[in-house]
Amino acid sequence: MLAIFTTVFIDMLGFGILIPVYPLLISEGSPFRVTPEGWSFTQGLIMLGWLQGIFPLFIFLAAPILGQMSDRYGRRPVLAVSIFGTAVGYAIFAVGISTANIPLLFIGRALDGITGGNQAVAQAAIGDVSTNENRAKNFGVIGAAFGLGFILGPYIGGRLSGPDKSFYGLFNTPDWFSATTPFWFAAILSLCNCALILCFFPETLK
């Protein structure tokens, strides 16, 4: 359950983690602005709308395909490959910010959306191992992971993108934190989750 919980959590983390980074990508004077100098703020907002929308769009398109693949090849390999793809998507997005490359941003979000379709696989795996007695509880845990990822995504994105900011008076964030830090963090988290799937998650498809 831990591996499945983490998978769903990271998928939804990817939806919210971008929200606090948005202004940095289009604001005048921001060191992480990716839009050309000639673009208006409205044009930047339109670009951000497409950038946010491409993620759920590709989840919608990919979820049935990944679900069918998991029925044929098994839950474990499809989960592992898709989670690794999520890590790559985060890394591509971080590079896109660093290089102010808008196409890379869209590629990263699209790949993250495609691999984020593994929620269907995660739910299928839960169905495989659940009994009539614990089915509702197990799917409730997955729902909690869904909500937690969506809630913490914006918070993590905001915290990790701010250099030298006080953390409730306890310490300051490192001065090398930037708009790319949340995505490198999510990429590393995804790789750890991939290792968790490969090492500890048994195949559930009978």
Give residue spans per PLM region.
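Helix-loop boundary and gating motifs at the non-cytosolic
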Residues: M1-P56
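Hydrophobic core of transmembrane alpha-helices in multi-pass small-molecule transporters
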Residues: F9, G89, I102-G117
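Central cavity-lining transmembrane alpha-helices of secondary-active solute carriers
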Residues: L48-G67, L148
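C-terminal ends and interior cores of transmembrane alpha-helices
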Residues: F84-T99
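Cytoplasmic helix-loop-helix junction between adjacent transmembrane helices
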Residues: G108-F146
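Helix-loop-helix hairpin linking two adjacent transmembrane segments in secondary transporters
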Residues: I142-C199
